[in-house]
Amino acid sequence: MFKNLSLKVIVFGFIFTFFSSFGQSFFLGIFNTSIRETLSITHGQFGSIYASATLCSSLLLIWVGKKIDDINIFRFAIYVTLLLSFSCFFFSKISSIVFLFSAIFLMRFSGQGMMSHTATTTVSRYFTKSRGRALSICWFGLSSAEFILPVLMVFLLSLIHI
Protein backbone atom coordinates (compact mmCIF):
# COMPACT_ATOMS: atom_id res chain seq x y z
CA MET A 1 0.00 0.00 0.00
CA PHE A 2 2.56 2.62 1.12
CA LYS A 3 6.33 2.48 0.79
CA ASN A 4 8.82 2.86 3.65
CA LEU A 5 9.16 6.69 3.63
CA SER A 6 5.48 7.08 2.94
CA LEU A 7 4.59 4.95 5.95
CA LYS A 8 6.87 7.05 8.17
CA VAL A 9 5.19 10.24 6.95
CA ILE A 10 1.74 8.80 7.64
CA VAL A 11 2.77 7.67 11.13
CA PHE A 12 4.20 11.16 11.73
CA GLY A 13 0.89 12.69 10.64
CA PHE A 14 -1.10 10.28 12.80
CA ILE A 15 1.00 11.09 15.87
CA PHE A 16 0.82 14.84 15.31
CA THR A 17 -2.95 14.81 14.82
CA PHE A 18 -3.31 12.59 17.90
CA PHE A 19 -1.33 15.01 20.05
CA SER A 20 -3.06 18.03 18.57
CA SER A 21 -5.79 16.92 20.97
CA PHE A 22 -4.14 18.73 23.85
CA GLY A 23 -5.29 21.95 22.22
CA GLN A 24 -8.71 20.72 21.12
CA SER A 25 -11.91 21.75 22.90
CA PHE A 26 -12.92 18.18 23.75
CA PHE A 27 -9.74 17.81 25.81
CA LEU A 28 -9.49 21.26 27.37
CA GLY A 29 -13.14 21.06 28.38
CA ILE A 30 -12.27 18.28 30.83
CA PHE A 31 -10.65 20.92 33.03
CA ASN A 32 -13.40 23.53 32.70
CA THR A 33 -15.05 22.92 36.08
CA SER A 34 -11.86 22.78 38.13
CA ILE A 35 -10.48 25.93 36.47
CA ARG A 36 -13.72 27.85 37.00
CA GLU A 37 -13.86 26.79 40.64
CA THR A 38 -10.20 27.64 41.24
CA LEU A 39 -10.50 31.09 39.68
CA SER A 40 -14.10 31.72 40.84
CA ILE A 41 -15.34 32.58 37.36
CA THR A 42 -18.63 31.87 35.62
CA HIS A 43 -19.31 29.75 32.56
CA GLY A 44 -19.72 32.95 30.56
CA GLN A 45 -16.43 34.40 31.74
CA PHE A 46 -14.62 31.18 30.96
CA GLY A 47 -16.26 31.02 27.54
CA SER A 48 -15.29 34.61 26.75
CA ILE A 49 -11.68 34.00 27.74
CA TYR A 50 -11.63 30.75 25.76
CA ALA A 51 -13.11 32.35 22.65
CA SER A 52 -10.75 35.34 22.83
CA ALA A 53 -7.68 33.17 23.29
CA THR A 54 -8.78 30.92 20.42
CA LEU A 55 -9.30 33.88 18.10
CA CYS A 56 -5.90 35.33 18.97
CA SER A 57 -4.19 31.97 18.43
CA SER A 58 -5.82 31.58 15.03
CA LEU A 59 -4.64 35.04 14.00
CA LEU A 60 -1.07 34.14 14.98
CA LEU A 61 -1.37 30.87 13.05
CA ILE A 62 -1.87 32.86 9.85
CA TRP A 63 1.59 34.38 10.26
CA VAL A 64 3.52 31.51 11.87
CA GLY A 65 1.91 28.77 9.76
CA LYS A 66 3.62 29.94 6.60
CA LYS A 67 7.03 29.45 8.24
CA ILE A 68 6.67 25.72 7.60
CA ASP A 69 7.62 26.47 3.99
CA ASP A 70 10.87 28.17 5.03
CA ILE A 71 12.20 25.77 7.66
CA ASN A 72 13.23 22.11 7.46
CA ILE A 73 10.15 20.07 8.41
CA PHE A 74 12.04 18.04 11.03
CA ARG A 75 13.26 21.21 12.74
CA PHE A 76 9.81 22.78 12.49
CA ALA A 77 8.24 19.68 14.07
CA ILE A 78 10.70 19.84 16.95
CA TYR A 79 9.83 23.50 17.59
CA VAL A 80 6.12 22.70 17.54
CA THR A 81 6.57 19.73 19.88
CA LEU A 82 8.62 21.79 22.33
CA LEU A 83 6.04 24.57 22.25
CA LEU A 84 3.23 22.10 22.94
CA SER A 85 5.22 20.61 25.84
CA PHE A 86 5.78 24.07 27.32
CA SER A 87 2.10 24.91 26.77
CA CYS A 88 0.97 21.81 28.67
CA PHE A 89 3.27 22.68 31.57
CA PHE A 90 2.05 26.29 31.55
CA PHE A 91 -1.58 25.10 31.45
CA SER A 92 -0.96 23.02 34.58
CA LYS A 93 0.05 26.17 36.49
CA ILE A 94 -3.04 28.33 35.88
CA SER A 95 -3.48 30.64 38.87
CA SER A 96 -5.11 33.78 37.47
CA ILE A 97 -7.26 35.08 34.64
CA VAL A 98 -4.16 36.30 32.78
CA PHE A 99 -2.54 32.88 33.12
CA LEU A 100 -5.78 31.26 31.97
CA PHE A 101 -5.92 33.37 28.82
CA SER A 102 -2.22 32.77 28.11
CA ALA A 103 -2.47 29.04 28.76
CA ILE A 104 -5.52 28.57 26.54
CA PHE A 105 -3.88 30.71 23.86
CA LEU A 106 -0.74 28.55 23.95
CA MET A 107 -2.66 25.26 24.03
CA ARG A 108 -4.93 26.24 21.15
CA PHE A 109 -2.04 27.65 19.10
CA SER A 110 0.44 24.83 19.66
CA GLY A 111 -2.00 21.93 19.90
CA GLN A 112 -5.02 22.51 17.73
CA GLY A 113 -3.24 24.95 15.43
CA MET A 114 0.40 24.05 14.85
CA MET A 115 0.29 20.29 15.47
CA SER A 116 -2.61 19.90 13.02
CA HIS A 117 -1.03 22.28 10.52
CA THR A 118 2.31 20.48 10.66
CA ALA A 119 0.69 17.07 10.19
CA THR A 120 -1.49 18.14 7.28
CA THR A 121 1.20 20.13 5.50
CA THR A 122 3.79 17.37 5.84
CA VAL A 123 1.51 14.60 4.60
CA SER A 124 0.22 16.78 1.75
CA ARG A 125 3.77 17.63 0.73
CA TYR A 126 4.84 13.97 0.44
CA PHE A 127 1.76 12.61 -1.31
CA THR A 128 0.36 13.55 -4.67
CA LYS A 129 -1.30 10.42 -6.02
CA SER A 130 -2.78 9.03 -2.79
CA ARG A 131 -3.04 12.31 -0.86
CA GLY A 132 -6.68 11.79 0.14
CA ARG A 133 -6.03 8.32 1.51
CA ALA A 134 -2.89 9.43 3.33
CA LEU A 135 -4.66 12.40 4.94
CA SER A 136 -7.58 10.19 5.97
CA ILE A 137 -5.23 7.84 7.77
CA CYS A 138 -3.37 10.78 9.27
CA TRP A 139 -6.58 12.33 10.64
CA PHE A 140 -7.54 9.00 12.20
CA GLY A 141 -5.05 10.09 14.87
CA LEU A 142 -7.46 12.78 16.05
CA SER A 143 -10.40 10.37 16.03
CA SER A 144 -8.36 7.91 18.07
CA ALA A 145 -7.46 10.61 20.56
CA GLU A 146 -11.10 11.71 20.87
CA PHE A 147 -11.89 8.15 21.91
CA ILE A 148 -8.88 7.47 24.15
CA LEU A 149 -7.83 10.71 25.86
CA PRO A 150 -11.02 11.80 27.65
CA VAL A 151 -11.46 8.38 29.24
CA LEU A 152 -7.78 8.16 30.12
CA MET A 153 -7.67 11.69 31.56
CA VAL A 154 -10.80 11.24 33.68
CA PHE A 155 -9.35 7.97 35.00
CA LEU A 156 -5.98 9.59 35.80
CA LEU A 157 -7.66 12.56 37.48
CA SER A 158 -9.73 10.18 39.60
CA LEU A 159 -6.51 8.61 40.87
CA ILE A 160 -5.33 11.93 42.26
CA HIS A 161 -8.84 13.02 43.32
CA ILE A 162 -9.15 16.18 41.23
Enumerate the language-model features and the residues they cover:
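Extracytoplasmic
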Residues: 9-43, 61-64, 149-153
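Juxtamembrane helix-start elements in MFS-like secondary transporters
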Residues: 41-50, 135
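Conserved small/polar residues in nucleotide/adenosyl-binding loops
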Residues: 160-162
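Hydrophobic core of transmembrane alpha-helices in multi-pass small-molecule transporters
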Residues: 18, 98-114
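Glycine-rich segments within core transmembrane alpha-helices of 12-TM secondary carriers
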Residues: 130-150
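Intracellular juxtamembrane helix-capping segments at the cytosolic ends
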Residues: 113-127
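Conserved MFS/SLC helix-loop-helix module at the cytosolic interface between two early adjacent transmembrane helices
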Residues: 59-97
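Residue-level signature of mid-helix packing/kink "hotspots" within the transmembrane helices
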Residues: 54-62, 146-147
